[in-house]
Every structure is written in structure tokens, then in C-alpha cells.
Amino acid sequence: MRLDKFLVACAVGSRTEVKNLLKAGRVTANGKKEKSAKLQIDEERDEIRFDGQVLEYEEFVYYMMNKPQGVISSTEDPKHRTVLDLLDDIARTKEVFPVGRLDIDTHGLLLLTNDGQLAHALLSPKRHVDKTYLAQVKGIMTQEDVETFAKGVPLKDFTCQPAKLEIVSVDSVKNQSLVRVTIAEGKFHQVKRMVAYCGKEVVDLQRLTMGTLVLDENLERGEWRRLTKEALENLLASIA
């Protein structure tokens, strides 16, 4: 691996910043100052230091984002901002991608990573990874709707797997409900379509959980952070 790529991967700085840091003599390779960005290193064996601190290579990174509305869950889009536009320059150099998708008007928990194996496992239909959503609904959800979800909602093109519908609150004056929906699938507009089947309309949708991951309440919309060590260990253990 080239030294400059290694330094960028270790979040020392952007490619341009790293070259300047090398020129300034702030990087050593195996105890010697190194100024060549093109130097080929063995990230497992060579000792690379920045300002005296040993750097450890991270092959994979994992970010939790509170996706806002109006942003596309994609790596690129010709018309809209994407979730990658919300990351800083260093995070974008990790070549992460969103694990699954949230509709442009849906907000909440989104995992971004460059770990393709983890992403595949979480999205595999065989694993039935639960995802929980909080939905503001126009109309009054009933116990009958709870039972319909539990049986599996028959949509036009497929029948949903049994899902859990919890009625959090009902406001008969405003004709609206707040519900929590847990599904093991992730089909296009699935929660909205399931609610529509019951004769109601989702007006706001937020994802709260994905498998063992739970949205951090302290993350404002559009903010992101690295997964904690504990959260990552639990997530990896859940798909092992």
C-alpha cells in the first residue's frame, strides 16, 4: 500500500494534506523520516508514526448516521444530495456506502460502511434482520390492523412477512396515530404500503433500529459518528 493512502486511511488528513505533512517531516517509517508519498509499505509489519504516534490501519469503518429528509441513500445522484455529502472529507476517503436504503422523505438510522460482507449479511433475506420504524399516521390505527400486520399484509405484488404493529398513541380529534412498526424485510415503500392497505396514510417515517443497532438519541438529523466498540461487536456477533 502507498504511504499516502495509508495515512489517509488512518484519518491523518486528506490526500493533499498528507503530502504536505510528509514534506514537513512529520511522518516516520520504521524510525526514519519519510517524505515520499509513493513509498510502498506493509501496513501489517511496518511501523508508521505521525508526530510520534503509532498509526494503526483500519481496513473497515462503520458509521451511524441520523439521515435527514431530502437526502438520497446512495453514493451518488445527479439531482439530489446524498448521504455521502454529509460526511467530512476524511470519512469519504474510506469509500463507504449505505447499508440498505431509506426513502428520500424517510429519516433516522442509517449504517454506512466499506465492509461488503457485513452489508450483505445484514441485507440478506435469509437472515430476517428486524428493522423498527416510528410512523406518524393520518387515520386511526386499530387492533384489527395489529392483527392484519401479524398475519402478513397481502400487497399487490407480494405478501409481507408477519410484522409487529404497536399503537403508541391515538388522537381521535386530529384523526392521527403514532405507531411503531417492526419488519424483517425491506421492500420498496413497504411500511407506507402496509399502512395504506389498512386505509391510512404515513405522513412521517423514522427508522429507529436495524438488527442490534439503535439510533443514538443525541445525533441530530444529518449528524453521524463512528459506531462504538460495543455496538460494533454486538452487530458482528448477531450475524456470525
Question: What are these model-predicted stretches?
Answer:
Residues M1-A240:
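Basic, flexible Lys/Arg- and Gly-enriched helix-loop patches that mediate nucleic-acid binding at interfaces
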